[in-house]
């Protein structure tokens, strides 16, 4: 039986682009991913993930999307969010009407925060993808922005952690947003000063339109 109360501690989270389910049959990859409390598998190209691969986790799915009308067309994108079973009682899925997004509301009792925290896991197809031929919104980051607004409309202004593969190149630029998750410790153990924005050092110095928009969204909702 899972306890409904825990002593707040560091929570581990990762986003990992698997480019199809075949990579999950590598034992070393599964061992690495299984260590995390929350593990977002990106680009599953599938509608499900075999549950026996991660017996210690519950699996939350948003299926891939066919980019053509052909029934035989391969699914594109797709997410699977693994949640360790001892954490699952502290997690509520928030259903949203967007492809390639998973939203969870995580209890303050797990994180030691004053409010629940929203996890928003995302895969954005690149700007050149034919996916955008079938949508009203041509900039994928604008979909994230609208999803955040929907969550705020439902739950108020909760702290939010955004993670995934955005196909957004930000170079060495950073947003003006600080880490404002309202807890007395760094829940992810990322830095000594959890409320500062670290200096980015990236080998990819290019900034694209998705990247600029993403930085603006981070600042907008800080």
Regions found by a protein language model. Give the residues of each.
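A shared catalytic/ligand-binding motif for oxyanion handling
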Residues: 1-222
């Amino acid at each position: 039986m899972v306890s409904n109360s825990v002593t707040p501690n560091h929570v581990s989270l990762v986003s990992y682009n698997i480019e199809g389910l075949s990579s999950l049959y590598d034992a070393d990859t599964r061992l690495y991913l299984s260590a995390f409390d929350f593990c977002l598998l990106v680009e599953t190209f599938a509608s499900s993930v075999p549950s026996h691969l991660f017996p210690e986790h519950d699996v939350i799915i948003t299926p891939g999307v066919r980019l053509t009308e052909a029934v035989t067309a391969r699914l594109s994108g797709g997410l699977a969010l693994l949640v360790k079973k001892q954490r699952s009682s502290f997690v509520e899925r928030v259903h949203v009407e967007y492809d390639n997004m998973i939203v969870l509301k995580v209890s303050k009792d797990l994180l030691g925060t004053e409010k629940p925290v929203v996890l928003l896991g995302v895969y954005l197809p690149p700007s050149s993808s034919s996916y955008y031929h079938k949508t009203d919104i041509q900039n994928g980051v604008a979909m994230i922005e609208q999803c955040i607004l929907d969550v705020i409309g439902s739950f108020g202004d909760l702290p939010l952690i955004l993670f995934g593969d955005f196909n957004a190149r930000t170079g060495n630029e950073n947003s003006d947003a600080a880490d404002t998750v309202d807890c007395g410790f760094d829940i992810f153990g990322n830095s000594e000063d959890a409320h500062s924005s670290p200096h980015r050092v990236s080998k990819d110095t290019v900034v694209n339109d998705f990247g600029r928009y993403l930085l603006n969204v981070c600042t907008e909702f800080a």
